[in-house]
C-alpha cells in the first residue's frame, strides 16, 4: 500500500490540556478509519474518543507500515500535549502551535511544528527529527525533574528556528539541538554528551554540571561559571554542517564534577567578559 495522509481538524478550541499520545503513525498503522475515530484521547484527564475532538479525513485504511503514515494536525493548539509520543516511523505535521512534551521518548520518524511549542520538546528522545518553526519552552531535549544526568535526549536532531527557554539539553547524552535564536539560563546543564548550538544569546552558566558533550554559544552569554577553565581560541566551529565562521574561546568543564565538556563562546560578542581569559591562554594564530 502507498503512503497515506490523515488530516485532523479540531472541532473546537480546547479549554484544557489534551493528551494526544495515541495519535501517532504507529497507532494508526494497519487500522480502518472507523477504528481510528475510536482511539482513546484524554481531555483534561477524561477519556474521550478521537472523533469527539477532531474531524478526521483520510483513506479507509492506514498502511501497515508506520513509515508510510503521515498525520497532519490542520489546526494546532498549545493544549495538544504528547504529540509523537514514542513514535518510531512516519511523519507528523502540526499547522500551528503545540503543547508540552512534543516527541517525548520519540524513537524515529519526523515531527514538524509550524508554530511554537511548550516545555520538554524532544525530552528523552532516542532518534528521529523534530523541527519547530517558532520558539520552544524549557528543557528542550532534556530529562525530567529528579532524574540523573544522561537521562535526557539520547539521539536524533532537534531544530528550533526561534528561541528556547531555560535548560536546553538538560541531562542529554547524545544527539544534536540547534537553536537559531536565543536561549535561557543553564544551556547544556548536566550534559554527558551530544551537542547544543545556540546561534544567538544565552543566559547564565551554560554547561553547569556537564561532564561531556559540547555547547556552542554564537552570541552573548550572561556569565560563565568559575569551574570552567579557558583552554584555547579556535577560528571557527562546525556542527552537523552548520559553520559559525568567527572566533570562539573554548572552555573545559565543569571541573566540579570532573567534567571534560566543551563550551565554545563567541569571542567577538563577549570581548569584555573574555578579555581576561584571553590573557591566560596561548593564542593559536587567531586575530581577535
Q: What do these predicted ranges mean?
A:
Residues 75, 89-90, 94:
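LRR N-terminal entry segment and analogous cap-like coil->beta motifs
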Residues 93-102, 112-121, 133-144:
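Intrinsically disordered, low-complexity linker/loop segments enriched in Gly/Pro
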Residues 1-78, 82, 129-133, 137, ...:
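Intrinsically disordered, low-complexity terminal regions
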Residues 109-127, 199-204, 209:
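Generic detector of contiguous secondary-structure segments
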Residues 143, 170-171, 190, 228:
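Short, well-ordered secondary-structure micro-motifs
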Residues 79, 83-86, 98, 102-105:
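Metabolite-binding pocket within alpha/beta catalytic cores that recognizes anionic/polar moieties
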Residues 87, 106-107, 118, 125, ...:
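Tandem repeat scaffolds
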Amino acid at each position: 500500500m502507498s503512503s497515506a495522509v490523515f488530516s485532523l481538524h479540531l472541532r473546537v478550541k480546547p479549554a484544557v490540556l489534551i493528551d494526544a499520545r495515541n495519535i501517532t503513525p504507529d497507532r494508526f498503522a494497519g487500522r480502518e478509519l472507523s477504528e481510528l475515530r475510536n482511539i482513546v484521547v484524554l481531555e483534561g484527564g477524561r477519556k474521550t474518543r478521537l472523533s469527539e475532538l477532531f474531524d478526521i479525513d483520510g483513506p479507509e485504511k492506514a498502511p501497515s507500515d508506520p513509515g508510510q503514515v503521515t498525520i497532519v494536525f490542520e489546526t494546532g493548539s498549545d493544549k495538544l500535549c504528547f504529540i509523537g509520543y514514542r513514535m518510531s516511523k512516519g511523519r507528523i505535521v502540526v499547522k500551528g502551535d503545540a503543547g508540552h512534551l512534543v516527541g517525548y521518548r520519540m524513537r524515529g520518524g519526523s515531527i514538524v511544528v509550524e508554530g511554537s511549542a511548550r516545555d520538554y520538546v524532544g525530552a528523552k528522545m532516542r532518534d528521529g527529527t523534530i523541527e519547530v518553526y517558532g520558539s520552544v519552552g524549557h528543557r528542550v531535549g532534556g530529562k525530567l525533574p529528579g532524574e540523573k544526568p544522561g537521562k535526557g535526549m539520547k539521539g536524533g536532531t532537534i531544530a528550533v528556528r526561534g528561541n528556547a527557554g531555560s535548560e536546553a539539553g538538560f541531562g542529554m547524552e547524545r544527539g544534536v539541538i540547534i537553536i537559531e535564536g536565543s536561549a535561557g539560563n543553564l544551556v547544556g546543564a548536566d550534559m554527558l554528551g551530544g551537542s547544543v548550538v545556540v546561534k544567538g544569546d544565552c543566559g547564565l552558566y551554560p554547561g553547569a554540571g556537564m561532564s561531556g558533550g559540547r555547547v556552542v554559544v554564537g552570541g552573548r552569554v550572561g556569565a560563565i561559571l568559575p569551574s570552567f577553565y579557558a583552554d584555547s581560541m579556535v577560528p571557527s566551529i562546525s556542527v552537523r554542517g552548520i559553520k559559525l565562521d568567527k572566533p570562539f574561546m573554548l572552555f573545559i568543564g565543569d571541573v566540579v564534577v570532573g567534567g571534560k565538556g566543551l563550551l565554545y563562546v563567541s569571542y567577538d560578542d563577549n570581548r569584555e567578559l573574555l578579555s581576561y581569559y584571553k590573557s591566560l591562554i596561548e593564542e593559536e594564530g587567531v586575530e581577535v
